[in-house]
């Protein structure tokens, strides 16, 4: 499969989509991004790298971090993690509080904000500095010691995290948050402020495409069965309340973030990351979604 030719076709045809959508502005540091930016990269388990556009421009991974935090928490807790967070699509916005009261403080899944806060609570109990553990985990996945979080973005998020604080206090009232709220919020904001580029993020998700094993290091991150199940969660819950439409159009397990990035995997074949900061109404990259739809259409490859 000539993935480089496919990426170049996508890069050519995506131009009219750039500049559309709305850059996330509820976090002031993210509002500085340009909706005309675009990068895309594919990495295979054999080490092949295909890229176009600004594929090595750093951006804030935001909710993409939830995938890796969940993986790290599952390493530590195993199946008991699911006693505190569900595995069902939400159908509501990623920062909604609506379902928490009806469901006794148990978030629907680990990829909405409430679920991610529970996951971060797990990490805060297990590590002295959960955000440092996350950064070290990401560095290990991509073999890049320069991966880090942006303190300006983290501070900007901390100053505008009232809704997340409300969720955290609410879940704590149900006994589903064990660490102090500010400890969890601080770690969560720093985790979301990790900066990476498309090539490294495509590389970071490859363990899911490779049965839970990092191809170049041989490190087993999680067992094969949990890797499949985590991919299933990405498929059903990874793109906010637009997961159904995403699966219909793209057909790959994916996780998006309001920084404009989307990562996806095709088991046995590749990890892919696309980045363009202009977002649709659900908080997914407008051009990124279109690019991934074209990728699976032009390659004829999806999980279906």
From Swiss-Prot:
Keywords attached to this entry: Hydrolase, Plasmid
Protein's UniProt keywords contain Metal-binding: no
Keyword DNA-binding: no
Gene3D superfamilies per the UniProt record, alphabetical: DD-peptidase/beta-lactamase superfamily (3.40.710.10)
InterPro entries recorded: Beta-lactam/transpept-like, Glutaminase
Origin: domain of life: Bacteria
Recorded catalytic activity of this chain's protein: L-glutamine + H2O = L-glutamate + NH4(+)
Group of enzyme by EC: hydrolase
GO molecular function: glutaminase activity
GO biological process, one term: glutamate biosynthetic process
EC number annotated for this UniProt entry: 3.5.1.2
Chain ranges passing through the membrane: none
Pfam families: Glutaminase
Residues the record lists as binding substrate: 63, 113, 157, 164, 188, 240, 258
PANTHER family: GLUTAMINASE (PTHR12544:SF29)
Protein family according to the UniProt entry: Belongs to the glutaminase family.
Quaternary organization: Homotetramer.
Name the record gives this protein: Glutaminase
Organism of derivation: Ralstonia nicotianae (strain ATCC BAA-1114 / GMI1000) (Ralstonia solanacearum)
Lineage of the species this protein comes from: Bacteria, Pseudomonadati, Pseudomonadota, Betaproteobacteria, Burkholderiales
